[in-house]
Amino acid sequence: MIDQRLLRENPNLISEGLKSRGMDVDLGPLQKFCKDLKDLEEKRNSLQAQGNSIGKEVGQKIKQGLPHDSEEISNLRVKGNQIKKQVGIIEEEEKSISNKLNEQILCLPNLPEKNSLEGKNEKDNKELRRWGEPISGNTLKEHWEIANQLNLWDSERSSVIAKSRFVTLFKHAAKLERSLINFMLDLHIKKGYLEVLPPALVNTASLTGSGQLPKFAEESFRCADDDLWLTPTAEVPITSLHRGEIIPRDLLPLKYVAYSPCFRREAGSYGRDTRGLIRLHQFNKVELYWFSTPETSEDALEQITSDAESVLQELELPYRVIQLCTGDLGFSAKKTYDLEVWLPGANTFREISSCSNCGDFQARRSSIRTKDNNKKNILLHTLNGSGLAIGRTMAAILENGQQSDGSINLPKALIPYFGSNKLQPE
């Protein structure tokens, strides 16, 4: 959530940040709400001061011997009660305006960091580095073709069970999925992450706190009879793991790793990636999440990105690192690096991880704080990154490991988990 103080004191900074995202927002109504709230607060404080003064005057007069039921005391109490009613009316006005203001502010994305990479869309993103040697060739198959030939899954029966964009994994694919999850968790735990297994259902406050609501309501699956939603990413429940808390500074950074099933309606992707594991309504993911101090979050983004990269390196999968421009940033992010893995069958790089520094954006929405060096409460910073998306990782392994005899060579790092170095046709 954007800081209301910034909205009052430096609206031009907000306008510039939103314009760099391609948004031309009229902040006038929001500024008026802020001014009205400030005026009402001053009026309420003045009335409360008058009320306190009357209360003291009543006490003094009673001490001086004036009877409780005297006309003077009664008049003062009537005046005090009138002030209380006025204060109550003002508080209701403040609540109403504050709700309207919050509704609109919640729809505004995070502001890009200073000196961000400017740009309108993904075409303006910047490649920072590459790792590994991408293979290529006209005979290389896409992962969904390989999976069909090896009988690794069934999407047709899955559409009977649920609908399109679901898959059921069988035998080696199911085992490979489980192996990848355990491998990734173990790798990150060795790097100092604390494993958590959060709920797959979250409430509206959790989705609002992380920034998924209200903007992405149409992208999420919602329960009909409860205030619960299927989580689109473990980022949501982990953000709310400390909602409303003050985390001691000496505990920071808090580094969590979580496996979770993720659910997305993919409402805006009709006709895209209809085959395979790239874009499903349900998929598994290992998520990395940091709570950090404000002054260390820039370095934390570099580290969380490096930790996500280490998975690809261990799995011997070529990839590149992309810095997103301002026009391509996610809603809650102020800076993001995407990791794109090479898919030789498709002859393209595809996003497999997105690592973001959200600054205090989620912390403000979720009221998560820490102490500064002067013991004053301040908002901390949050960061997240996929470490990695399991289905897309499997797709990359199938495509990069394919052999001329139809078998799939598996990365050495997976052998202790999978129990074999190959997937063989049966």
UniProtKB/Swiss-Prot annotation:
Keywords annotated in UniProt: Aminoacyl-tRNA synthetase, ATP-binding, Cytoplasm, Ligase, Nucleotide-binding, Protein biosynthesis
Residues engaged in binding ATP: R264, R265, E266, E351, I352, S353, S354
PROSITE patterns in the cross-refs: AA_TRNA_LIGASE_II (PS50862)
One GO CC term on file: cytoplasm
Keyword Acyltransferase belongs to the record: no
GO biological process, alphabetically ordered: selenocysteine biosynthetic process; seryl-tRNA aminoacylation
Keyword Cytoplasm included in the entry's annotation: yes
Record remark: domains: Consists of two distinct domains, a catalytic core and a N-terminal extension that is involved in tRNA binding.
Family, similarity comment: Belongs to the class-II aminoacyl-tRNA synthetase family. Type-1 seryl-tRNA synthetase subfamily.
NCBIfam families named among the record's database cross-references: serS (TIGR00414)
Name this polypeptide is given: Serine--tRNA ligase
Organism annotation: Prochlorococcus marinus (strain NATL1A)
Lineage, highest ranks first: Bacteria, Bacillati, Cyanobacteriota, Cyanophyceae, Synechococcales
